[in-house]
Curated annotation (Swiss-Prot):
Modification Asymmetric dimethylarginine occurs at: R52, R53
Protein name (record): Protein Tat
Region (Disordered): 1-20, 45-101
Record lineage: Viruses, Riboviria, Pararnavirae, Artverviricota, Revtraviricetes
Positions of region (Interaction with human CREBBP): 1-24
């Protein structure tokens, strides 16, 4: 190895900087471009802002921490509560009483 000027900072040593600039490409050649590219692209290590992660849902069986809610009434049927058979009879009665139509 050739001697290096001790007054130079390590990142300014000859040969420490690549001749070409770093790119956003993730091909094998660009991932091995320099040490920075290798750690960020190749290994996926970055010390910048963290990406937002989705929260993991708790397992279904661990509901001991939740306050018990009162049971809701069973779903009520929509529409006529008398049922479809009685409504048909009702329509028949109305048509019998109005023979004018």
């Amino acid at each position: 190895m050739e001697p290096v000027d001790p007054s130079l900072e390590p990142w300014k040593h000859p040969g420490s900087q690549p001749k070409t600039a770093c790119t956003n490409c993730y091909c094998k050649k660009c991932c091995l471009h320099c040490q920075v590219c290798f750690t960020t692209k190749g290994l996926g290590i970055s010390y910048g802002r963290k990406k937002r992660r989705q929260r993991r849902r708790p397992p279904q069986d661990s509901q001991t921490h939740q306050v018990s809610l009162p049971k809701q009434p069973s779903s009520q049927q929509r529409g006529d509560p008398t049922g479809p058979k009685e409504s048909k009879k009702k329509v028949e009665r109305e048509t019998e009483t109005d023979p004018d139509n």
